[in-house]
């Protein structure tokens, strides 16, 4: 995919961003094949050049992309529940294992993601936390998840999703759930290392977390 991207959500701050993203149709087709014969998951590997591209892809690509490295984006279906995200992530992991690829999974999405109303937004654009989180309880929920990340307690995060969803994580936290499932799901023991400070803006919470592969494997 090549072109320039202006975000319909953030045109003031993200406009005419150039991108030149090489795809990986072989891996996409391999992931699609994981759903063959199943009635609990449907996967489409789309190479339609008119399929819209979104800032969750372009923003990450701008900083981490390499024109010589294959890159593939995966949609997050907000009709899914936790089990759906877990299944899809597991199938992605299966496809990667069947391939000859060395793959980095980037879960591009935020934590609590409820916005203040329109009149309040201009007063809440700084990155000060927890003042600019919509509700202090949502901030506390984010901190609880980050604490579990730091301990490698992915089972605790996954099992706690019914409660955490009350804090309105972006995309029902599907970006994390798919990534975690590809790495072993509840059995994954990779600890999370903060690569940034936790930031809050207009009601929402964001942070960068890196999960290094344990020496003995993702579920060691």
State the predicted function of each range.
Residues 90-103:
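Non-transmembrane, aqueous-exposed alpha-helical and coiled segments at domain scale
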Residues 1-87, 118-220:
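Flexible, D/E/H-enriched segments
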Residues 30, 88-92, 108:
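Short, hydrophobic/aromatic alpha-helical segments in well-folded domains
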Residues 74, 101-109, 179:
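Beta-strand elements within well-structured catalytic alpha/beta cores of enzymes
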Residues 111-119:
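A structural signal for small-residue-enriched, beta-sheet-centric alpha/beta enzyme cores
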